[in-house]
Amino acid sequence: MGKVVGIDLGTTNSCVAVMEGGKPTVIANAEGFRTTPSVVAYTKNQDQLVGQIAKRQAVMNPENTFYSSKRFVGRRVDEVNDESKEVSYGVEKAGSNVKIKCPILDKQFSPEEVSAQVLRKLSDDAGKYLGETVTQAVITVPAYFNDSQRQATKDAGKIAGLEVLRIINEPTAAALAYGLDKKSNERILVFDLGGGTFDVSVLEVGDGVFEVLSTSGDTHLGGDDFDRVIVDHLASTFKGNEGIDLRQDKQALQRLTEAAEKAKIELSNATQSEINLPFITATPEGPKHLDLTLTRGKFEELASNLIDRCRVPVEQALKDAKLSTGEIDEIVMVGGSTRMPAVKELVKRVTTKDPNQTVNPDEVVAVGAAIQGGVLAGEVKDILLLDVTPLSLGVETLGGVMTKMISRNTTVPTKKAETYSTAVDGQTNVEIHVLQGEREMASDNKSLGTFRLDGIPPAPRGVPQIEVTFDIDANGILSVNAKDKGSGKEQSISITGASTLSDNEVDKMVKDAEMNASADKEKREKIDIKNQAETLVYQAEKQIGELGDKVDEAAKAKVEEKRIKLKEATEKDDYESMKTLVEELQQELYSLGASVYQQANDASQAAADSNTDSKVDGDDVIDADFTETK
């Protein structure tokens, strides 16, 4: 079994780690950074960019730069109305699913495909570090992700060419990293406020056992929302002064978003931030500039509703765990957004404890995922992880009511069966509507899909016995089976109508990704060989000039001949000729260098021989007179 990497696939940034020598190690990306922006872009040349390089060009290419795609993964269009209005790229409807529009390629991507490109970069960079191809991973998701979102994350891994061995909840991963070496039992509360989601989990950890007691959260709350209140403030202020709504201009919106994120980060350490955006727009009178000072107090006032929303999941998680704040030993803060002073203050106020800040909030989740990868690979022993399902699961029954089969915070994996019957006389089929959520009415909960069981023998209502079985695996992913006890007819779901991709769609995306990866690799190789050729042409020209008459003309002529041919090949983009000529010119330069040293050695030897011949014989005596002067 090869190395299993742990990947924190974040809304804003992602991170990858691996177990080395029994210890988790965070792997730096190809650019040398320990976290990678979860951003994918396509340029006017149709080149794909991922990570920091994609983020840097976002202002100039807002419609083809895709960020925060995690907020769309596994969701239907009607679930992301607000989020789709806040991004600079187009979000479209395809059936009930979300598609991301890419004008430069004239095509649509599923959010899973965008996430897959981020995963591919992380796994490729990890492979370069490890010196082997990475094919297996543990990927983290917010604890409050529903079944569709978990399956969609697994699909993204598959599209990226990864076998996803386990989907693990982010707070649980953080607890693994925090509690790996803890021997005594502790009850900890993990407060995880990331770029797009918010989770709270209460766990009991100690001596290798990690038991999740409860989890709660909000998948529509994260750092992006804090950025948005700053964007709205800047845009409203500018509109009040200039009468122009910058949110209608995609390029201006992207600049506002980047400025808002920068200001938010600065205000975690400073009491005010200067926001200066020259030439943000123009009117017939000339260019307009945005120049504004945002204080920490004003930011906290703007974000007060968001900060208050963090309180409820904390209280709910404690209530579900049947614990008081006094029974919690440590508060572990996870996610970059927990650096905000107002968030720290809220946690301290609600829990009456100072947060533990010994873990790196940007890396701890990936570290925990790597530990879980080590457990699955057999590298890490004596770890028992007991996680829970975040939301109740059930079916719709007569009257549009949701009947719960598995309650939230049930330890997974788990399996439960219930027997139901028909609603009318002579009914020969039943439709099973699978739901996830906490509301009483089916219409108020998340629909995971429907399926039909046919072939039920006609009988009076209430007589047939239909056994419905819910089975949740260790990834928190649900499968449902329905069986008529009378006829033995059975139907397992493939949940239809859910926002996850079909197997055929995933397989097609896997093939597309492989083809693109191959094309990208070929394109990269061409760029590398051309860069190498141009560098070598320059080095050869410089070397000949510096050596001058120190080498014979014949040797210089050979180098010059190859140099000219290679230069012509680069100008024509003749890559095959470049490959051959690079090697040939390199050899000629080696020979030229060797001849220089040979000539220098010959000259040194000649000088040594000359000195030997001119030495004075030691037996000769020379007489001399001297006079003493007083």
Swiss-Prot record:
Residues 619-630 have a biased composition (Acidic residues). Residues 601-611 have a biased composition (Low complexity). The keyword Nucleotide-binding applies. Keywords: ATP-binding, Chaperone, Nucleotide-binding, Phosphoprotein, Stress response. Induction: By stress conditions e.g. heat shock. The keyword DNA-binding does not apply. The modification Phosphothreonine is found at residue 197. Transmembrane segments: none annotated. Residues 601-630 are annotated as: Disordered. One of its GO terms (molecular function) is ATP binding. Belongs to the heat shock protein 70 family. Acts as a chaperone. This is Chaperone protein DnaK. The gene is dnaK.
